Curated annotation (Swiss-Prot):
In the N-terminal section; belongs to the carmovirus double gene block protein 1 family. It comes from the Viruses. This is Protein p31. The lineage of its organism: Viruses, Riboviria, Orthornavirae, Kitrinoviricota, Tolucaviricetes. One of its GO terms (biological process) is transport of virus in host, cell to cell.
Length: 279
């Protein structure tokens, strides 16, 4: 069920009581998180009966990327707050976020989010098929699905602990920080195009630059995704993951702008705000 098909109850309380959906909004930026269907407990195929899997069907952030006060839209932040509110324990992110092709001001998860309780429930081996079926997602493949098939290693779930005392559950990053040139090359090769949140995605940056954000800034996508090193460190650490603090300006001479802080499927990354070699 998508947000466009759901009639919103008049209040957050009513929505939680009636559908188990949590809504968070920020008046200053007119942001609305719709249809986080934490909702029903569903038995995972192949798992013991007492082990339940909670599915969040779809996450849609309307209007633009300014979801939090830092001007950083990271769906994992949103999901983490919902998981924490419902005391659901750890969860795994099985998909990436992408830009709305029409407006450039939306990010969503095109596949299911599996929220695991504190049992030993395992993620199904055939995540691409089984999770979509359990979550009731459409069978039509998105660009994210195609890229996942071609490069499944890029989408391996990254366990995130919401309890700082359980930091040992957070695996170390498999790569060193500041891999922007490498991933820009992947963007150039069309592996992550249209749902990656890099500014260096070919064909996206120039188009989005022409669309003012709701605060009247001409380059809304770029501005809304940039944050300072200290801010990134604080935000990332608040979710139980040690952020990378490599001084990118010293590593990459061409880096002269604020850096981008966001969630990549392999772990937290702080990357230069642009890749001029592709612009």
């Amino acid at each position: 069920m998508s947000s466009s098909q759901t009639q919103s109850p008049p209040t957050d309380v009513a929505r939680r009581q009636q559908t188990g959906t949590a809504v968070r909004s920020e008046d200053n930026h007119r942001n609305q998180l719709e249809n986080i269907a934490v909702g029903k407990l569903t038995k995972s195929e192949g798992a013991p009966a007492q082990q339940n899997v909670i599915i969040a069907k779809e996450v849609v952030i309307n209007n633009h990327f300014n979801f939090n006060x830092a001007g950083v839209c990271v769906c994992r932040f949103v999901l983490a707050s919902v998981v924490k509110e419902f005391n659901l324990g750890d969860f795994d992110l099985l998909d990436s976020v992408h830009l709305d092709e029409d407006t450039g001001h939306r990010c969503r998860l095109s596949r299911a989010i599996g929220v695991l309780d504190r049992s030993d429930t395992k993620i199904p081996k055939d995540r691409h098929t089984q999770w979509r079926q359990v979550a009731g997602l459409p069978e039509v493949e998105s660009s994210a699905d195609v890229a996942w098939k071609q490069n499944p290693e890029l989408f391996e779930p990254t366990r995130l602990s919401l309890d700082p005392t359980r930091s040992e559950t957070v695996p170390p990053l498999r790569e060193q920080p500041a891999p922007c040139p490498k991933f820009c090359l992947q963007c150039q090769q069309q592996l992550l195009t249209r749902f990656s949140r890099f500014q260096c995605v070919q064909g996206l940056t120039s188009r989005l630059e022409r669309r003012p954000d709701t605060l009247g800034r001409p380059n809304g996508w770029q501005h809304n995704h940039r944050c300072g090193i200290q801010l990134c460190s604080t935000l990332c650490a608040s979710l139980g993951r040690h952020s990378q603090q490599t001084p990118l300006a010293d590593t990459f001479p061409w880096h002269s702008s604020p850096i981008t802080c966001y969630q990549y499927p392999l772990g937290w990354r702080m990357l230069p705000g642009s890749c001029p070699q592709l612009q």
